[in-house]
Amino acid sequence: QAKIDQERFKWLEYYKVKFKGTWYTNIVDKLVLRSQAEFGFLGAYNQDRGTVPFERFFVGGDGLGSFSLDGREVVQLRGYPNQSLSTTDGNTVFNKFSLEVRYPITLKQLASIYALGFVEGGAAYDGFREYNPFSIKRSAGAGLRIFMPAFGLLGIDFGYGFDPILGGNERNGWQTHFIIGQQF
């Protein structure tokens, strides 16, 4: 068994395709709508060997604290705990949709502060046979961002997950997410 696995992973042959589109629309005065769609797929060149266990997608949470050595890619979805919407080994397909309304409180040189409200939906799948872009986990919430040139982007979000996480029956409820130097 160990010899077979060594041969299987001797040469990692895979491809990873990701699409991400972000659109900003000025609604009224300083109010801005940010809409975003993401999609990712991990495939194998040699179907006999299957998909590699590395570079898989893990959906859920804010992405902080995802220290791993297997090259996993964390897809942030507020309102849920980190990596809670994927299987233990990760998934090969994901999609995510989000709408965010932003309003600047101050746009000074030393610190830009803005408030936001969001709705998001996303999911992870084990392949295209399971893929259904309308079967997603949904969340909504509000947050605050501050950008300071000395520190970068800092923020806090309060998200409510409307759907149960994998293996659960109840709604997820409220989650607090901290943002440090990254864009949601």
Describe each region flagged by the PLM.
Residues G60-L69, R129-F184:
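C-terminal beta-signal and terminal closure region of outer-membrane beta-barrel proteins
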Residues G61, L110-S112:
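Glycine-centered secondary-structure boundary/capping sites
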Residues A37-F41, I113-A124, P133-K137, G159-F162:
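Active/binding-pocket-proximal capping segment
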Residues V28-L33, T106-Q109, I146-I156:
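Repeated loop/turn-to-beta-strand initiation elements of outer-membrane beta-barrel proteins
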Residues E100-K108, Y131-N132, R145:
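Hydrophobic alpha-helical bundle architecture
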Residues Q1-I105, G117-F118, Y125-G127, L166-N169, ...:
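C-terminal outer-membrane beta-barrel translocator/porin domains of Gram-negative envelope proteins
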